[in-house]
Amino acid sequence: MLDGLVLRFARDRAANVAIIFALMMIPTIYLLGMALDYTQALRKQEQLDAAADAAAVASVRPAMLTQTDDTVIQNTAAAVFAAKANLPGLTTVPVPTVTVVDTGLQRTITVSYTAQSINNFPSVLGSPAWPIRGSSTARASSAPNMNFYLLMDDSPSMAIGATQTDIDNLITYTASKYQSASSSQNCGFACHETNIAHDGGTQDNLAIARSRSITLRIDLVTSAVNQLLNAWSNCPQSGVSGGVMQCMSALNNTTYQAALYTFDLGLNTLASLTTPKAAGAKVSNIALMPVAYHNCVNTTNNCKTDNGTDIAGALTSINSSMPTPGLGSNTVGDTPQEVIFLVTDGVEDKIAASCPNATFAGNSRCQQPLDTTICTTIKNRGIKIAVLYTEYLQLKTPNVTVTDGWYMSWVDPYNEPTSSTGTIAKNLQSCASPGFFSDVQTGGDISTALTNLFIKVASSTASLVQ
């Protein structure tokens, strides 16, 4: 009887399908449960990864890069992570592990976690939760604390008219009708001569320029330094007073100091290293170097020529007063980075025993593109040099073939084929640290150029690496 029932059941095709279906339901239910729980765990992991990303990035923001206490950094990262990691479907809120590694100015933050995603089919999978884990790494180089040494050329060549219109007006108003000193007539330079009577004049070209509201290149340099230290209206951070330097200090959470110098025959100290605000109070003291009269540099009997630009000498003097730079971090015992900002037309004009980049113009007068030997010495100490080249161009005089014959003989050869590619420009580029060179031609915006160059030196970036 039983044998017959079994045989009949085995022969029944409908029964076979039922059995096969029943047998297949077991792995199907298992796979379906596993897929649902695995998908849920992946979603939880993505959310926790985002929380780890946020925590890592928050720990390398500029405000946090000034923090030197690892515990504070770790607690900050943990708090940001916890705010985003309190998710339903986890056995507990995970507590992240935060590691902080500082290497010089670079900080690396790693936020890692482990968690358990609750399974909806624990009996099917044989486990109440699915383990998940992840990590995120953020790495940023903090902007360094810096000392800036602003070195401005105030030699007679900086008395050139600021624009072509200024040059034309200066030439017009230094004609014999207005200027009785023959050596200063028809000149695009507003030289400051304290004894113009020696040459038969009653007022020097600087006085004429001021009375005619003619803007000079030295005026643009002064305005650019004023924007750097005293007044800038474009700071993206509200509540910051002062110039570009104070704005960048606030944005980067750094400490900047500034020193202010001019140079001609030698180095002139306007403000020793101090706060940007204190240095800014001395900007009004930037002025052209005075000469006694044409072909004389002082009021003694030792007049040699109207030379007055010793760039290498000024760099040598400033180098002797600068300390060895540090990394610029906030680590105890570290010191700021040191940066020289040189603003010049790049042509030396001095009495010297040797003239390596040119031939003597006479009376040991060396008029040459900058000898970059001192630049190499400075950079080898780890000091950075930023250079703003205010290009030395030939003066174009209306209806006069050549009024600047001296320039054509002793300067123009070093400006060929163009002022941007000649030896003067090349030597200044060589003097500057990589990427820290900018140039401005007559009529160019010196304030914008100096501001952009400063921002380039002071800027840093942060990036996320996962």
How would you name each of these model-derived features?
Residues 2-26:
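Glycine-centered recognition micro-motifs in short, flexible terminal segments and loops
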Residues 19-36, 50:
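Alpha-helical hydrophobic helix detector
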